[in-house]
Amino acid sequence: VIVAVNTGSVHLSIDAVEDSILACGLPPGWQVGVAAYETVRAMAEQNLRLGHDVVVDAVNDSEEARQTWRTAAARTGASIEFVHLMISDALEHQRRLSGRDRCLTYVGEPTWADVQRRRADYAAWSDEVLEFDTATWAADEVADALTARLSTR
């Protein structure tokens, strides 16, 4: 969110959209996740066509998920920058996870076991990606560094 504020970009969150879809009574499952990605892709494309920069908050752990954003960029002529935020210190990662509350009703906060499972299945990147290890950085420091890096590209 901070990067979007710093850059004047539109912020779109997969989890917020998924939470809204689940609030409509649809059963949780991979189909809802795909629907959330496709919904955000459509919103991103509309905003890109209007000339807005877009920051999408998504895990993007698979090639299929990443292709969603390549498609949006190709359809709109926009450039794309993938950013991977990670926490190399496992204890710090667990600490942050235990204190996390995104105020979502239907999309729960992941457990440490969920994070470990997802990490095991995380697809290698085929794109150029800006990677930030946030283990020793505060959120605003990460956002400032990321904003500075993106402004030079």
Segments the model singles out, each with a brief description of its role:
Residues L48, L150-R153:
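Short, hydrophobic alpha-helical segments
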Residues T76-L97, F132:
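Conserved phosphate-donor/acceptor-positioning beta-strand/loop module used by diverse small-molecule
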Residues A16-E18, D61, M86-E92, T136-A138:
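Conserved nucleotide-binding/hydrolysis micro-motifs of P-loop NTPases
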Residues S9, V54, I80-E81, V129:
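Hydrophobic anchor at the start of a short beta-strand
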Residues Q31-I80:
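Glycine-rich phosphate-binding loop used to anchor ATP phosphates in small-molecule kinases
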